[in-house]
Amino acid sequence: MLSVFNTLTRQKEPFKPITPGVVKMYVCGPTVYNYIHIGNARSAIAFDTIRRYFEYCGYHVDYVSNFTDVDDKLIKRAAEDHTTVPAVADRFIKAFMEDTTAVNIEPATVHPRASENIPEIIAFVQALIEKGYAYESAGDVYYRARKFKKYGQLSDQRIDDLEVGASQHTADEETDRKEDPIDFALWKAAKPGEISWESPWGAGRPGWHIECSVMSTKYLGDTFDIHGGGQDLEFPHHENEIAQSEAKTGKTFANYWLHNGFVTVGDDNEKMSKSLGNFVTVHDIIKTVDPQVLRFFMATTQYRRPIQYTQANLDEAANNLDKLRNAYRNLTFRLQDATNGTDTAVAEQLQTLITNFGTAMDDDFNVQNGVAAVYELAKLANVYAAKATVQKETLIALQKALVQLTGVFGVTFETANATLADDAIQALIDEREAARKAKDFAKADQIRDDLKVQGIMLEDTPQGVRFRKE
């Protein structure tokens, strides 16, 4: 049975979805004022991998991940760029979709935007006021944190020990508007020139935390299975989401809370920051790094563990990914001369590896042990493909397993940069072979070089010429 580490209880628990066969999952998305950095990518890749494993196990996954497109950072960026907040949001949502597509992250079932849910946000805030959990003060609306008796449970903190400014309101005049310094903002009164919407409390905009409470429950219901995000969101963001949502509905907000680990940069394990000059965006990385390598590097570290982003670790991931690609190519190549039938011994070994993969992943998505089973599968594939005689059904079974298991990590064996179809490549290989037999080596070399320019590498083997797409 699949078990997950629940941050709320600080222990592994058997995963039992609310609806059998269905997983309802919300993951906090980016604030869209810039290109996503590798910390954002780590969260997106980790939860995409978790989603893919659920799908591999046969679950239907309703996956919701938001865009925060109303925020102080967007307002600042719009002012710097002499444009509007919606224009900034549109630009970086487009960039987000391009970057996440490049690293093979599946789009969410729904990607809601805060700005498109203002009426629902206002209604949610009004309900909290009516229940006595929120109050208006000079156009702002604040949440009474102490009134929610479970406040601090997720982050394992006592409310008296919590930092002032959980709402990101720390200026003196803002603190003065609160009944209690620990209270946090649900609605912020508009400042001159800022984007705003009319509300019962005057013109303003939503606070950050209320956006996720509204959008998650709108699409997944008052109670859903999994809420995910980075460890940095555990407090105050997720703590505040629970307080808001459960105060309004009187129901458990999310049954399981999953948090991914941090990313450090360089051999010194430095925390990424603009001031240290080590701030790295996916947009820049994939200009020089194979997006599949970045994906594989991040997907094969267990989601709760920290990741050290270094060139050496990227190189190791590239080498391991290459081994998987080679195994797939070796199986594909041998299909052309395979005989009918099944090798029962290999079939048994394959089933053992598939079982080992599932056992590992069922243990809180232990991708390290899971990918170890995949590497063993690649070795088995290579050994079998090197035999003098191979059987078609066994090759297909090995190839299918390799595709399915690596697919959980987001690996694909398609090649986007090779423009020729396989039939056309084979025709050129045949032409090259004819030229070699005619001792026209100049022509044979020219065909090889022309193919290389298009990303197609030829390998001469005892079984004949094979090609691979770089």
From Swiss-Prot:
CDD domains reported in the protein's UniProt record: CysRS_core (cd00672)
GO CC, alphabetical: cytosol
Pfam family, one: DALR_2
Keyword field: Aminoacyl-tRNA synthetase, ATP-binding, Cytoplasm, Ligase, Metal-binding, Nucleotide-binding, Protein biosynthesis, Zinc
Keyword Transcription: no
Presence of keyword Mitochondrion: no
Cofactor(s) needed by this chain: Zn(2+)
Principal cellular location given in the protein's record: cytoplasm
Motif ('HIGH' region): 30-40
Residues reported in the UniProt entry to bind ATP: 274
Catalytic class of the enzyme: ligase
GO BP: cysteinyl-tRNA aminoacylation
EC numbers: 6.1.1.16
Annotated cofactor note: Binds 1 zinc ion per subunit.
Sequence motif 'KMSKS' region, residues: 271-275
Family statement drawn from the similarity comment of this UniProt entry: Belongs to the class-I aminoacyl-tRNA synthetase family.
Protein name per the record: Cysteine--tRNA ligase
Record gene name: cysS
